Amino acid sequence: TGKDGVVLATGGFGANAKMVQEYNTTGKWPDLSKTGTTNRFSASQGDGITMAKDAGASLTDMEQLQLLYLGNLVDGQISKFPARDVNGTDQIIFINKEGKRFVREDGRRDQICGGVLNQTDKMFYILESGDGAGYKDIKDPAWRSGDGFTFEYLEKNGFIVYADTLEELAKKLDMDPATLQATVDEFNKSVESGNDEFGRTLYSTKLEKGPWVATPRQACVHHTMGGVTIDPEARVLNEKGEVIKGLYAAGEVVGGIHGANRLGGNAVVDTVVFGKLSADTLLADTK
């Protein structure tokens, strides 16, 4: 019934395009009103933040928005792709529609997304070869993507482009084969020398043999670092810094936990720690 208190754990607002654009004020990102999201559309609408604000809660870091470059081109979800299941980050490169690299693949999320948004049609391909000890044959009938899809489904629906040779792949992607080959050759030189034109430092193998897989991706709104302000015990605070009695919060609905650029995986710790802490505090406050 909430008579003793309420814990807000309603998530962020990454799937609410209007709200995202309202707080997109730092100049870091272009207009995001039509940008996809990796969040489920029925969730991450910012409802909890809005309700808390109506109850007098202070908001923190609402302008801090994180994008992720792994959204598929259909609905923006981090799904339906073999990348990193076939090979790790150290064995892939990112290419634009012209067949050229444009960013360090082991860079920060915001830097990669900024690069993606400057490319033709604001998209790119994750390029993988048949090299590397971790390579998996995605045409094997037993193979499935991380979310359970077969090679046939992914290829038929355009989630991946597959070819036995790099030249064949370039033609399927409507790229100049010579340009794509030159891009791969230059990267392979970087693997040998350890000096990359974009500053990449993570390598493990050259890209030399087929089959080749290109996975089209886009930068999408992923995490919203802003939300309600809490004290160290997860009590929600008002604009004067005073505790709003009986109101607690945990997870992405809270602002000020991750700063301007959340590190991947840190939100898991955030939800676990403050989820327990908010419940413990509520119980302690009602004794």
Q: What are the residue ranges of the model-derived segments?
A:
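A glycine-rich dinucleotide-binding beta-alpha-beta segment and adjacent secondary-structure elements
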Residues: 179-261
